[in-house]
Amino acid sequence: MSMKRLGSLGALLLLWGCGTDAPLPVEPLAEEYCAACSGIASCERLVTDALTVVCPDETEAYYQCVTDNSCDETRCSDQWAAREVCMGNAPRDKVRVQLDGLRPAANLGHRGSGETDPDNPFPESSLNGFTAAIIAGADGVELDVQITADNRPIVIHDDTLDRTTNCTGCVNQMTFDELRLCRLLDGEGNITDQKLPALLEVYTVVSGDSLVNIEIKTFGDDCASDTVSIETMVVELLDGIETIGVAERTILSSLDESVVELIKRERPGYYSALISETPGSALIERAVELAQDAIHPSYEISADDVQSALDAGLQVNVWVVNGAELMQQQIDKGVTGIITDEPEVLAELLTEQP
């Protein structure tokens, strides 16, 4: 284990009151690990305490993995992630805490500053639109990703290019580089200088603690393909999020149950949510069965169902909510987050709450 990870374990153990009384007998695995992988004098004591106090099964699996792999921690990331989940220190836990800290509700800009429309000066899903949402007071943005012909995620809502760009055809039938040659249209149908964003570009403009809600799309019948794989895209998306280090401010969501199942299988510590156009008890039950962190229902969800979801340990982020009156209704229901085309209206309304 690295000095950083072992040091963090020691700090946690001291915080929890471990290491202050008579020491526990040294665990054989602690002896084996410390002899091979650490020169810290207190290593055996810290590892023994961790093995017996802090998520012992997950901790043992991690130390055993590192020891068995000649102290190469990089080969034990799954075991470390499982331990973080057990400890409540996974990215999903930090997202949950951040959302709860934004009460009475988090303000998430839908496709940035809203859908492409004559009244919206920015194209939907554009870097300018995402930037505008944050400037308007949004706590984060909601966006959609589709899969390209070379199995890469790209930011666009539709599975075709016709409505929002100067290109035509299915997104999944063009490569990432080909799609980057397309330009987004404004609400009047004029060609802008805005490209379809890469995910890293969005995180660059939506920076700091701002949240990014990624809805993972699956293509419709008109764009069905045997050459591209949703599973491949999801795995690449998850790897990309991990590589750039933004999981602690990322919400992953999908209408497709197989997608959110895959997310939890590949990254159980990431925050994910099941979307539904039909709110109700069945959605809540299914989200719990799928070990989701939240539901993303339409705003028609009842106050009783919001409370039932919260009682079940789920957060509730509703969509797409426009107009101050409808926004206030969602706040009164107790929802966790509101996805809106009008982040500036919601930002002002939230400042007026008691």
Segment roles from a protein language model:
Residues 2-12:
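Sec-dependent signal peptide recognition
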Residues 5-6, 59, 173-176:
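Alpha-helix initiation and N-capping motif
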Residues 15-17:
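C-terminal motif of bacterial Sec signal peptides marking the signal peptidase cleavage site
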Residues 19-91:
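Mature extracellular/luminal domains of secreted and GPI-anchored eukaryotic proteins, especially small
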Residues 20, 88-354:
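Phosphate-group recognition and catalysis centered on beta-loop-alpha active-site segments
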